[in-house]
Swiss-Prot record:
Alphabetized PANTHER family for the sequence: IMIDAZOLE GLYCEROL PHOSPHATE SYNTHASE SUBUNIT HISH
InterPro entries referenced in this protein's UniProt entry, alphabetically: Class_I_gatase-like (IPR029062), GATASE (IPR017926), Imidazole-glycPsynth_HisH (IPR010139)
Stated name of the protein: Imidazole glycerol phosphate synthase subunit HisH
Subunit details: Heterodimer of HisH and HisF.
Entry EC no(s): 4.3.2.10, 3.5.1.2
Keyword Cytoplasm attached: yes
Pathway: Amino-acid biosynthesis; L-histidine biosynthesis; L-histidine from 5-phospho-alpha-D-ribose 1-diphosphate: step 5/9
SUPFAM superfamilies in alphabetical order: Class I glutamine amidotransferase-like
Positions of the catalytic residues: C76, H178, E180
Compartments in which it is found: Cytoplasm
Keyword terms, alphabetized: Amino-acid biosynthesis, Cytoplasm, Glutamine amidotransferase, Histidine biosynthesis, Hydrolase, Lyase
Gene that produces this protein: hisH
Length: 199
């Protein structure tokens, strides 16, 4: 199984590269999709405004691959970009694959950004949910997704508000947490992604 991590030109991709290799993927880092990969990964580095411009400019290529059944994994910001729009750095368009908006965590009594370990609450079970319910994973973010279609939410996390931890529709999966920084639970989730692609 081949995975390509899309390099937006910001941040360190070594952790997600290593995490994917550990669960069995052949991994490459590239600025463009190759067309023969089983999984395209949008990593969780950068800002919505900068990354959305990079990815939306290549949306047509990604759309062709998505319609052909290539899997997509978005991590943190990489998941947020899959929604219609986000407010970080001004109002910017996302890829629009998931309906809804990305906005700041809106709660007066929690510290922003949300950095550290928090619990995943699975609300919809499929192969991607196996072994992660009630487990702690690592977060580092100030913005969250507010989906208009709640059926895409597989699991949530509570931090002042309940927000999506994992979303999935068709061949698209996104996580607000960083599986590559979430120790054994993160590895289990990436293993789930590997098996999900093979089914």
């Amino acid at each position: 199984m081949r995975a390509v991590i899309i390099d937006y030109g910001v941040g360190n991709l070594f952790s997600i590269y290593s995490g994917l290799r550990r669960v069995g993927f052949e991994v490459e880092i590239s600025k463009e999709p190759k067309g023969s990969e089983d999984l395209i990964v949008f990593p969780g580095v950068g800002s919505f405004s900068a990354v959305s411009k990079y990815l939306v400019a290549r949306k047509e290529k990604f759309e062709v691959l998505r319609s052909n059944g290539t899997g997509f994994l978005g991590i943190c910001l990489g998941m947020q970009i899959m929604f219609e729009e986000g407010t970080e750095g001004g109002l910017n368009k996302g890829l629009g694959w998931l309906k809804g908006r990305v906005d700041k965590i809106n709660h007066p009594r929690v510290k922003i950004p949300h950095i550290g370990w928090d619990k995943v609450n699975v609300i919809k079970y499929n192969e991607l949910s196996e072994g992660i319910d009630d487990q702690y994973v690592y977060y580092a973010h100030s913005y969250v997704a507010y989906p208009t279609d709640k059926s895409v939410i597989l699991s949530t996390t509570s931090y002042g508000i309940d927000y999506p931890a994992v979303v999935n529709i068709g061949n698209i999966v996104g996580t607000q947490f960083h599986p590559e920084k979430s120790s054994l639970v993160g590895r289990k989730f990436l293993t789930n992604v590997y098996r999900w692609l093979r089914k």
